[in-house]
Amino acid sequence: VADIVKAGRVALDGIVLKKSDQKVEADQVTLDGQPLEAPHGLLAMLHKPLGYVCTHSDGEGPTIYELLPPQWMNRKPSVTSIGRLDKDTSGLLLITDLGPLVHRYTSPRAEVKKIYEVTVDHALEDSLIETFASGEVMLRGEDRPCLPAKLDITGSHTASLTLMEGRYHQVRRMFASQGWHVEKLHRRQFGDYQLGTLEVGRWQMLDTPEV
């Protein structure tokens, strides 16, 4: 916290704080221009870096919650991510303390658009576009096919994949089912929210929708 204050990222009523031990009201404080408190429910967008896990406590590495304001961990109910990205995936994560909002986006019946940027181990083939769009791709251990997905090939080894569902490690498993290994994975859109220019490791407050 002291390092964040020294870096000039914390302000009180628009005035940058100089001391980390200064006592102020949380709802008057901003970090990188964003308010730290949201009394009626919180929704934020985080640009998750590689190497971070989405659990509150995990021995595998640092958690995404270390990137958020410490007082958010004391909210009741506590903040959580809407869905998860694995340790080796970067990109957009939504953070909230609103249970109904989590349910809205993660319910098995929810068809939420998710767009991923993918890099694979060997050259992509145009036939993969039709395969993913067919709605017939089966994942190992599952008894129903994936919903149709839109694949845009952007380079010999790169593509953009749009999904309307969120199964466990779905992108990696879909490519693996067709003989490709995903070497790099980044989510740039979730629902109507896009990362835009949000820097890696930073968060941004969003307007809370009605739930």
Placement of each model-derived feature along the sequence:
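Residue-level signal for inorganic ion chemistry
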Residues: 1, 13, 94, 118
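S4-like RNA-binding module at protein N-termini
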Residues: 2-59, 206
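RNA substrate-recognition surfaces in RNA-acting enzymes
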Residues: 15-20, 134, 140-211
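Switch/connector loops and helix/strand junctions flanking conserved nucleotide-binding motifs
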Residues: 52-55, 101-104, 126-129, 196-197
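A short, contiguous, amphipathic alpha-helix enriched in charged residues
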Residues: 56-73, 129-135
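Glycine/acidic-rich beta-strand-loop module
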Residues: 70-107
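N-terminal accessory regions of nucleic-acid-interacting proteins
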Residues: 103-128
